[in-house]
Design a protein with these regions (language model features):
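Flexible, low-complexity charged segments
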Residues: 1-107
């Protein structure tokens, strides 16, 4: 069974990433949802830790997003998802995070 948790950033689900390209600033709005295995033995404790650790997750998303450019972030969605999954499993020392779903809107 999987429980989905939307990553929140100061009360919003939008994580804004700004890119400067050729003197112009562009933005990517990133939304992230984590899939948690409710049958994992550490689910109860880790789901609380994850919900209380949104700032840490947002920082990880921002760090990962900055590896890309404004023009490549949307096309790199699958790579971003797999990299974030590995990063967050390591950060929270858990396998209960089973998926990371990212949506990117560039402006």
């Amino acid at each position: 069974d999987v429980a989905y948790v939307d990553v929140s950033n100061n009360g919003s689900n939008d994580i804004m990433i700004s890119y400067t390209d050729g003197g112009k600033t562009h933005y990517a709005i990133v939304n992230v949802t984590l899939g948690l295995n409710t049958k994992a033995k550490d689910y109860a404790s880790k789901s609380t830790t994850i919900n209380n650790g949104m700032k840490v997750i947002v920082n990880a998303v921002q760090t990962e997003a900055m590896k890309y450019t404004y023009s490549t972030i949307a096309a790199s969605k699958t790579t971003v998802e797999s990299n974030l999954l590995a990063t967050l499993q390591d950060t929270f020392q858990t396998e209960c995070i089973t998926s990371v779903i990212v949506s990117v809107v560039v402006q």
